């Protein structure tokens, strides 16, 4: 079975590359537009550092230094921010429910990563699925990777225990936060958590229950709130059925 999965994963990687190449002109256009939108958003919200200078905007708190200390550095000058102020973790649902659109998701991941990188934002791309009771988080592109080719290795299989995947991503950010102090997690999801492994009995669920439906959504929402309490910003790109749109909002 493992050999068969490896062979299927390699075939899917080839299909992902072929799909992106076939639609290269469209994807390039989307990257350019998205890059411009991200750059404009950064400019609007950017808080540039100000350094002491001999020209620029007069600093009232330093004016006294000119006559008393013969110090002409009584101005503030905007200084370009060379270091990124935040990182982005892009998390792709790689469960079997995504089998029908693997090439599209791989292309979306590449487009988002390329656009963010073009704006100087460090980005890491990971995928997740659950196999035989284990949730697997796979890093396709790390912060230090210049190449985006690893995203072509996106491959869907198994289930999606979203809550556990979100918790694992939080642990990954804690272990390897990247080169910036603030962090944004973007989840590409159909908002339909589902796993074959049942939830074990607990005081709230004496008989246990299936992981899916409202329980799965509540579990994922609770993990999102926990990440937010830890200082991470969490956003979602919804790509599921209209019937699940309300769950995505939760």
Would you name each region that the model predicts?
Residues 1-85:
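Acidic/polar low-complexity segments with low predicted structural confidence
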Residues 64-65, 80-140, 143-188, 193, 218-221, 226-228, 235-239:
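Von Willebrand factor
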Residues 97-106, 154-162, 209, 213-216:
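Alpha-helix N-cap/helix-initiation motif
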Residues 136-153, 204-214, 250:
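Acidic, Ser/Thr-rich peripheral helices and adjacent loops at domain boundaries
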């Amino acid at each position: 079975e493992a050999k068969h999965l490896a062979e299927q994963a390699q075939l899917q990687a080839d299909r992902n590359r072929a799909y992106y190449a076939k639609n290269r002109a469209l994807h390039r256009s989307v990257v350019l537009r998205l890059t411009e939108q991200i750059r404009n958003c950064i400019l609007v919200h950017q808080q540039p550092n100000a350094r002491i200078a001999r020209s620029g905007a007069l600093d009232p708190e330093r004016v006294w230094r000119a006559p008393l200390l013969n110090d002409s550095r009584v101005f503030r000058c905007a200084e370009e921010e060379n270091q990124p102020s935040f990182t982005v973790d892009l998390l792709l649902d790689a469960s079997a429910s995504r089998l029908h659109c693997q090439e599209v998701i791989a292309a979306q991941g590449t487009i988002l990563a390329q656009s963010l990188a073009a704006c100087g934002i460090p980005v890491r791309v990971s995928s997740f699925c659950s196999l035989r009771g284990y949730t697997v988080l796979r890093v396709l592109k790390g912060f230090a990777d210049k190449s985006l080719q690893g995203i072509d290795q996106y491959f869907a299989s198994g289930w999606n225990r979203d809550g556990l995947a979100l918790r694992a991503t939080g642990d990954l950010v804690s272990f390897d936060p990247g080169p910036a102090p603030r962090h944004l997690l973007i989840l590409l999801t159909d908002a339909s958590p589902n796993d074959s492994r049942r939830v074990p009995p607990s005081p709230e669920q004496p008989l246990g229950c299936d992981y899916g439906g409202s329980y799965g959504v509540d579990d994922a929402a609770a993990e999102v709130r926990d990440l937010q309490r830890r200082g991470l910003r969490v956003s979602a790109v919804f790509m599921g059925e209209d019937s699940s749109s309300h769950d995505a909002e939760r």
